């Protein structure tokens, strides 16, 4: 039993290290925007939802346009987000973009988390 607990602990450590390397939160992104850091923010929700409100400076790239990679940049980090914590579109987009050689992270909690944190919304 002890060996499997240690194995699980090692797997958990690796999982969370990987998660931290490839995810970021809305507050961190807000600070990056405020400081003028060079990041590309990619909204993978439907275009109609992007028009209702989005992260300031974000580019709309709904699923039907992922193959175009329009708006993605090779010279900086691309941060993708979708609707909410239980939405997997952001992770799916991130996998596809990473497979094409783009540096990419996912925003934890999606746009819902952005709103819950009371951050600025662009329209």
Mark where each language-model region is.
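Conserved beta-strand positions in the Rossmann-like core of class I SAM-dependent methyltransferases
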Residues: 40, 59, 105
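Catalytic cysteine-centered active loop of the rhodanese-like fold, especially the PTP/DSP P-loop
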Residues: 72-115
